[in-house]
């Protein structure tokens, strides 16, 4: 089964990418390795206005990965009470409707503040509901993310790691059931 882990920001050395790496390890542990798509790797030419009409070939690896996936696990930070602009732009650049229609999607949110990206995850649920995705109901919110990652970016909170593992395992089962 092909799960895409989408790191929802292009900020260098982001906590989002660190949490995505933790999830990548968790998916490997549960026997379902996931492929990471990092928005920091988006090709610069996707930002040219002509990309709305014709996507550059360098973007194909991103759209192809989403289209070939059985499910997408999206990790998002909270920027100014919302999702990162780059994440919304990425969603807008993907083929419509086939990128997310009937595709399972899970959400993990993280923030420096106390709400753990509750608002951006709820905003994404609206967007993906509109896109007719199958939304996995078990979300994980990571408040005060700077307090649960060590200097190397490793998660040091066993309870939070268990919640991420439970989410990943549940998402794999959710995707399997929807594939039947």
Regions found by a protein language model. Give the residues of each.
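N-terminal beta1-alpha1-beta2 submodule of the flavodoxin-like/Rossmannoid cofactor-binding fold
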Residues: 1-96, 154-180
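A short, flexible beta-alpha/helix-coil linker loop
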Residues: 9-10, 42-44, 107, 112, ...
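Mobile beta-alpha loop/short-helix "lid" or hinge segments that flank ligand
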Residues: 35-46, 96-98, 131-151
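Short amphipathic alpha-helical patches
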Residues: 50, 86-89, 110-118, 131-134, ...
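Short helix-loop-beta connector
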Residues: 101
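Short, glycine-/small-residue-rich phosphate/pyrophosphate-handling segment
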Residues: 104-144, 159
């Amino acid at each position: 089964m092909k799960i895409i882990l989408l790191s929802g920001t292009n900020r260098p050395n982001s906590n989002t990418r660190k949490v995505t790496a933790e999830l990548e390890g968790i998916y490997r542990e549960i026997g379902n390795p996931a492929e990471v798509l990092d928005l920091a790797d988006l090709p610069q030419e996707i930002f040219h206005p002509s990309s709305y009409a014709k996507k550059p070939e360098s973007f194909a690896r991103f759209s192809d990965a989403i289209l070939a996936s059985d499910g997408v696990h999206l990790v998002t930070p909270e920027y100014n009470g919302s999702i990162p602009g780059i994440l919304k732009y990425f969603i807008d650049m993907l083929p419509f409707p086939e990128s997310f229609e009937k595709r399972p999607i899970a959400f993990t949110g993280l923030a420096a503040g106390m709400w753990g990206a509750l608002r951006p995850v709820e905003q994404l649920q609206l967007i993906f509901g509109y896109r007719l995705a199958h939304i996995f109901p078990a979300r994980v919110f990571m408040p005060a993310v700077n307090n649960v990652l060590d200097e190397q970016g490793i998660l040091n909170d066993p309870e939070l790691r268990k919640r991420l593992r439970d989410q990943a395992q549940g998402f794999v089962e959710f995707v399997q059931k929807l594939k039947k």
